[in-house]
A protein has these predicted regions:
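Conserved ABC transporter NBD signature motif
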Residues: 40-47, 60, 94-99
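A short, proline-enriched helix->beta-strand linker immediately N-terminal to the Walker B motif
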Residues: 135-139
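ABC ATPase signature
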Residues: 75, 120, 133-134
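Conserved ABC ATPase signature
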Residues: 116-120, 124
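ABC-type ATPase nucleotide-binding domains, specifically the catalytic core motifs of the NBD
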Residues: 14, 52, 77-97, 104-110
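Helix-to-loop junction immediately C-terminal to a conserved catalytic motif
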Residues: 32
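Catalytic Walker B motif of ABC-type/P-loop ATPase nucleotide-binding domains
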Residues: 141-145
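The feature captures the beta-strand-to-loop junction immediately N-terminal to the Walker
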Residues: 17-19
Length: 171
């Protein structure tokens, strides 16, 4: 990818649109530091992050939900959510409150919290991937093809969840 430049303001919902192979996923991977840019600068909340380690970027509040409903399929829903809180240092009470927040936004996950993630439906796995990202306490949530492979009804539900998350202050 060459010559890309964009700003995302706090509270916005921004969409990258382009053909297959245009570089949308590569751009998200560079922003979240899964790929290292060869040149240029990426900043988040006024801080340069181009050479920052991925876990430190997460601690700053930038979290990505990868394409393809990536969950830890052999772990339970609860264990997947716990991994989202792994880098947090704000204490067990804050993490417990965020479990409840995720379960309130995504009630199916509460019903299935002891279920193995690989046995969930595609829509439930996508909800789990979003829930795991929310456990990181993001300021900005990067979603790579959040509706990929979902039925139209589930697409509407996922987009409603994204809207609710945005309304709560997450960019």
């Amino acid at each position: 990818i060459k010559g890309i430049s964009f700003d995302v303001n706090e509270g916005e919902i921004v969409t990258l649109i382009g053909a297959n192979g245009a570089g949308k996923t590569t751009t998200l991977h560079a922003v979240s530091r899964l790929l290292k840019p060869k040149q240029g600068e990426i900043s988040f909340c006024g801080q340069p992050i181009s050479s920052m380690e991925a876990h430190k970027i997460i601690q700053l509040g930038l979290t990505q939900v990868p394409e393809g409903r990536r969950v830890f399929s052999q772990l339970t829903v609860q264990q997947n959510l716990a991994l989202g809180a792994y880098t947090r240092k704000d204490g067990a009470d804050a993490v417990a409150a965020d479990y409840e927040m995720v379960f309130q936004r995504l009630p199916r996950l509460k019903e299935r919290r002891r279920q193995i993630a690989g046995t969930l439906s595609g829509g439930e796995q996508q909800m789990l991937a979003i829930g795991r990202a929310l456990m990181c306490k993001p300021k900005m949530l990067l979603l790579d093809e959040p509706s990929m492979g979902l039925s139209p009804l589930l697409v509407q539900e996922i987009f409603s969840i994204i809207h609710d998350v945005n309304q709560s202050g997450v960019t």
